[in-house]
């Protein structure tokens, strides 16, 4: 039963990888198909938006194709293994989880491709509101509580109070979620992640520091490029889109982002966002 939707999704994805943006995943009936249908919708939406772009760079298509191959291969291989009649329940659960994890990675990549495509083609227009940046940072950080507890990572925060910014809160949350995700992903068990928020009259400055593997200056120079992955071993899961998305959002908000890192020491990302002239309850 699992092999049919997996094959349908992988076949369609392969057509898109080869440049056929008219390919679509058909919706499937049954409550247990809901997860596969969501992936199908993401693939269809990506194909629709990519087909609307007048000029697609060859390297972009090649990189999309390359990044899709790994999760698709996992889905295909484990989908085949699930068909074995004598498969134990333990193995069945293990293989199903592998398919779920691979499909989630594929869906995340689709989401980032769509967001980046819209931002680059000015199809997303910022909707600025004035809000407390410290509160947003804390809310975003708390989403990773289970991760830092599981990895026994020490959390240190130094958040200045009453720092207001006028920005698109939803877009800005993408920045923090990507930076926190990277920090926890690259920090080993027992490490440390530090979040600080400071401000001067003009800017709010956010620093996210980890004690992870770090990176060389050569890698740091390219880290905000689409599909660039400093970890060429693929020991950590990623698709090289998150930081490109972060950079684009910060640019749209006329902010600044930089990175400092040292191999086997850790990494610090610094983001500067212009402060709001007035808080939400203040008047001119």
Locate each region found by the language model.
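Short conserved segment of the HATPase_c
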Residues: 215-227, 247
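Short beta-strand/loop element within the Bergerat-fold HATPase_c
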Residues: 190-202
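Conserved catalytic submotifs in the C-terminal HATPase_c
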Residues: 26-29, 127-131, 149, 154-164
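Glycine-rich G1-box
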Residues: 146, 213-214
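Short helix-loop "hinge" at the ATP-lid/N-box region of the Bergerat-fold HATPase_c
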Residues: 183-184
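Membrane-proximal HAMP signal-relay module
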Residues: 1-61, 78-83, 88, 97, ...
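Short alpha-helical segment of the dimerization/phosphotransfer core of two-component systems
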Residues: 101-107
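C-terminal end segment of the histidine kinase catalytic
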Residues: 251-284
């Amino acid at each position: 039963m699992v092999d049919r939707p997996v094959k349908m999704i992988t076949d369609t994805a392969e057509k898109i990888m080869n440049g056929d943006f008219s390919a679509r995943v058909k919706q499937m009936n049954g409550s247990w198909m809901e997860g596969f249908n969501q992936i199908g919708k993401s693939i269809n939406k990506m194909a629709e938006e990519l087909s609307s772009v007048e000029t697609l760079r060859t390297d972009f298509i090649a990189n999309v194709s390359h990044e899709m191959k790994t999760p698709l291969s996992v889905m295909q291989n484990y989908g085949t293994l699930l068909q074995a009649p004598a498969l134990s329940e333990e193995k069945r659960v293990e293989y199903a989880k592998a398919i779920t994890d691979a499909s989630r990675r594929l869906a995340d990549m689709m989401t980032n491709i769509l967001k980046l495509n819209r931002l680059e083609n000015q199809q997303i227009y910022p909707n600025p509101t004035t809000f407390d940046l410290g509160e947003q940072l804390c809310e975003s950080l708390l989403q990773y509580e289970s991760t830092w507890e599981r990895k026994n990572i020490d959390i240190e925060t130094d958040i200045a109070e009453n720092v207001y910014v006028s920005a698109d809160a939803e877009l800005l949350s993408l920045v923090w979620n990507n930076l926190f995700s990277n920090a926890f992903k690259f920090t080993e068990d027992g490490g440390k992640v530090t979040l600080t928020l400071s401000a001067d009259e003009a800017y709010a400055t956010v620093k996210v520091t980890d004690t992870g593997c770090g990176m060389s200056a050569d890698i740091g120079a390219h880290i905000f490029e689409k599909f660039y992955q400093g970890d060429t071993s693929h020991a950590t899961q990623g698709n090289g889109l998150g930081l490109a998305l972060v950079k684009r959002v910060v640019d749209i908000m006329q902010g600044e982002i930089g990175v400092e890192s040292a191999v086997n020491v850790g990494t610090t990302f610094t983001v500067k966002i212009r402060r709001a002239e007035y808080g939400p309850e203040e008047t001119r």
